[in-house]
């Protein structure tokens, strides 16, 4: 995005928006808001950094708060997977403070480097945005790539020395809750975060086709997935009932309760293919397999 595309220093952001609207009537409202932001800021690195960090905080805490209310008010208690382990407000608050500190000390510096990195690899910030179809298929690819990275790196983090040095912090809560999705050591945040940010960057480096707006939509969906997977609630309308290969809260809750298996983030296929599922069905299948081998 060329921040000097429109006249400089129009006054307020909304005055800049009006100017953009006059010169770019073909753009939709979101595209005009986007263009006005970069033009008004007059500093693309600062514009991207502020927008990225604010978006992350609003989405993360905005999505976590409903789960806090559900836990605190006892709503949907019948759907709580480990209903004897309801997190207290104190636990939620302590978790929130830890996560917020991590956001400012670990994630914020990386976010400020995002725009220079995006420019280096050719990510676009211009308008108009890509088509909905383009964003959909790219985000679907990112879900698959991130899930693959997450499975193998997460499984590696359960190796004894790495677990004790890095991953143990995340398993402080054996009954997870939404806010705890990013409750992790700085090293783990960077390792697993690579799947969310690094995979799309690599995609762009290989194809030369990726818009930062697509990245934002992807990150929002990934945050929703991570928070919901840690929510600790299994509903009749949970997504995996309609997409059997989707992981969901029931899949990840067992991982926190048993400290083993179910290493994937979004999908179930890696755990199934590599026999690391930890579900009643998988355990039964393993027992039957052992009995069959003994009988032979």
From Swiss-Prot:
Q: Which cofactor does it need?
A: Fe cation
Task: Kindly state the positions of the motif Histidine box-3 in this protein.
Answer: 251-257
> Is the keyword Transcription assigned to this protein?
no
Q: Does the keyword Lipid biosynthesis apply?
A: yes
A cellular component term (GO) from this record?
A: endoplasmic reticulum membrane
Name the source's superkingdom.
Eukaryota
- Under which pathway is this protein filed? Steroid metabolism; ergosterol biosynthesis
Induction entry: Expression is controlled by the transcriptional regulator srbA.
Regions crossing the membrane: 50-70, 98-118, 125-145, 201-221
* Protein keywords: Endoplasmic reticulum, Lipid biosynthesis, Lipid metabolism, Membrane, Oxidoreductase, Steroid biosynthesis, Steroid metabolism, Sterol biosynthesis, Sterol metabolism, Transmembrane, Transmembrane helix
Kindly list the GO molecular function terms attached to this UniProt entry.
C-4 methylsterol oxidase activity; iron ion binding
The UniProt entry lists membrane topology as: Multi-pass membrane protein
An example GO biological process term is: ergosterol biosynthetic process
Q: Where is this motif: Histidine box-1?
A: 154-158
Task: Kindly give the Pfam families that the UniProt entry links to this protein.
Answer: FA_hydroxylase
Q: What class of enzyme is it?
A: oxidoreductase
Short sequence motif Histidine box-2: positions = 167-171
Q: Which PANTHER family match?
A: STEROL DESATURASE
Q: What else is known?
A: In Aspergillus, the biosynthesis pathway of the sterol precursors leading to the prevalent sterol ergosterol differs from yeast. The ring system of lanosterol in S.cerevisiae is firstly demethylised in three enzymatic steps leading to the intermediate zymosterol and secondly a methyl group is added to zymosterol by the sterol 24-C-methyltransferase to form fecosterol. In Aspergillus, lanosterol is firstly transmethylated by the sterol 24-C-methyltransferase leading to the intermediate eburicol and secondly demethylated in three steps to form fecosterol.
Domain free text: The histidine box domains may contain the active site and/or be involved in metal ion binding.
Protein name stated in the entry: Methylsterol monooxygenase erg25B
What gene, per UniProt, encodes this protein? erg25B
């Amino acid at each position: 995005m060329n921040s000097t595309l429109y006249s400089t220093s129009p006054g307020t952001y909304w005055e800049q928006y009006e100017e953009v609207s006059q010169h770019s009537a073909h753009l939709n409202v979101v595209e005009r808001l986007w263009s006005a932001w970069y033009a008004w800021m007059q500093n693309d690195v600062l514009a991207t950094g502020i927008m990225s960090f604010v978006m992350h905080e609003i989405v993360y805490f905005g999505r976590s708060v409903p789960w806090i209310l559900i836990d605190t008010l006892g709503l949907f208690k019948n759907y709580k997977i480990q209903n004897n382990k309801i997190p207290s407000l104190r636990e939620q608050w302590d978790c929130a403070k830890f996560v917020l500190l991590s956001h400012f000390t670990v994630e914020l510096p990386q976010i400020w480097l995002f725009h220079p990195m995006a420019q280096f690899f050719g990510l676009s910030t211009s308008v108009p945005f890509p088509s909905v179809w383009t964003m959909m298929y790219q985000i679907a690819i990112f879900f698959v790539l991130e899930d693959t990275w997450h499975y193998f790196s997460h499984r590696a983090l359960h190796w004894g020395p790495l677990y004790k040095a890095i991953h143990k912090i995340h398993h402080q809560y054996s009954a997870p809750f939404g806010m705890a999705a990013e409750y992790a050591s700085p090293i783990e945040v960077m390792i697993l975060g690579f799947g969310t940010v690094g995979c799309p960057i690599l995609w762009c480096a290989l194809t030369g086709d990726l818009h930062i707006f697509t990245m934002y939509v992807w990150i929002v969906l990934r945050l929703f997935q991570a928070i919901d997977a840690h929510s600790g609630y299994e509903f009749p309308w949970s997504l995996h009932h309609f997409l059997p290969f989707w992981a969901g809260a029931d899949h990840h809750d067992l991982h926190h309760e048993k400290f083993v298996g179910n290493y994937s983030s979004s999908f179930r296929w890696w755990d199934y293919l590599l026999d690391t599922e930890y579900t009643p069905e998988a355990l039964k299948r393993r027992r039957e397999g052992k009995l069959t081998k003994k009988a032979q």
